[in-house]
Amino acid sequence: MAASLRLLGAASGLRYWSRRLRPAAGSFAAVCSRSVASKTPVGFIGLGNMGNPMAKNLMKHGYPLIIYDVFPDACKEFQDAGEQVVSSPADVAEKADRIITMLPTSINAIEAYSGANGILKKVKKGSLLIDSSTIDPAVSKELAKEVEKMGAVFMDAPVSGGVGAARSGNLTFMVGGVEDEFAAAQELLGCMGSNVVYCGAVGTGQAAKICNNMLLAISMIGTAEAMNLGIRLGLDPKLLAKILNMSSGRCWSSDTYNPVPGVMDGVPSANNYQGGFGATLMAKDLGLAQDSATSTKSPILLGSLAHQIYRMMCAKGYSKKDFSSVFQFLREEETF
């Protein structure tokens, strides 16, 4: 690892690790020494669009893996690479004392941890359990309580950056949990991400992720609307995107993940909206934001509208397409 843990912005209390930060020589040696000394097997549960490349980056850093996925075919390439595949989350917990889970929903996470063959059936005392799923903060807190009863440590560490960042190892991790355990989590998360941010107690990582994804959905819908309007007004989409990205309307949805086919290469819109982050998952995350807003009495007018739009998309056949397919949805649905 090319960076050490630092305390930045003392006034704000923000604590994070980034590859862009250069450590003092002594701390670099300490991090490298700890990393080499502790490359014992790591459990990884959930090998979907995000989990697959995340697990591969752990392999690249020399960590042996204990693998489980509910779909056996997802494990095959890891098994072919010499990694150990087991038949349940409980079996992962029996063989590894550091486990990362990357699952689609709160229900999946509850089953993986507390189910009949869940992690908690065989978890060892002192184990570190890191959940990188995006789930309800309240569920994270309940799982943490159950894990603590077993003498283990639970941290929520959802991610941002999408499949591209997962492949390149440049994810951002938002981490909630006991601060004293952050360094141990960072050792693993730093293999998969370029920014690892400590957010506070268990559940705060999920809170940060929910806020981020709500804003992402709103900005994607806004980008899709602006691009659609400009095209219908006679503008070339590539030219319009270029103008937006050198102007005040620039955002990640316009300059990195543009939703219009033909504007960018290497994004889902260039591949009939296949891969990436599904509209179903975005609708799920917006539902989490809606629930959190209701419980905290926080107005989210645009967030609520975004939730309605993505729910409509899923009902009209877009559920398996990337969330940027909202551009296609708006192009085809003219009666709002």
From Swiss-Prot:
N6-acetyllysine PTM positions: 60, 76, 121, 145, 149, 238, 242, 321
Catalytic machinery residues: 209
Keywords linked to the UniProt accession: Acetylation, Branched-chain amino acid catabolism, Mitochondrion, NAD, Oxidoreductase, Transit peptide
Major subcellular site: mitochondrion
Signal sequence, renumbered to the chain: none
Entry-annotated residues carrying N6-succinyllysine: 60, 76, 95, 141, 149, 238, 242, 297, 321
GO biological process: valine catabolic process
Subcellular location: Mitochondrion
The enzyme's E.C. designation: 1.1.1.31
Annotated transit peptide: 1-36
Xref: Gene3D superfamilies: N-(1-d-carboxylethyl)-l-norvaline Dehydrogenase, domain 2, NAD(P)-binding Rossmann-like Domain
Any single Pfam family the record assigns to this protein: NAD_binding_11
Domain of life (superkingdom): Eukaryota
First-level EC class: oxidoreductase
Pathway of action: Amino-acid degradation; L-valine degradation
Binding site for NAD(+): 40-69, 103-104, 108, 134, 284
GO terms, molecular function: 3-hydroxyisobutyrate dehydrogenase activity; NAD binding; NADP binding
GO CC annotations on file: mitochondrion
UniProt cross-references to PANTHER family, sorted A to Z: 3-HYDROXYISOBUTYRATE DEHYDROGENASE, MITOCHONDRIAL (PTHR22981:SF7), 3-HYDROXYISOBUTYRATE DEHYDROGENASE-RELATED (PTHR22981)
Family to which the UniProt record says this protein belongs: Belongs to the HIBADH-related family. 3-hydroxyisobutyrate dehydrogenase subfamily.
Assembly notes: Homodimer.
Protein name as it appears in the record: 3-hydroxyisobutyrate dehydrogenase, mitochondrial
Gene that encodes it: HIBADH
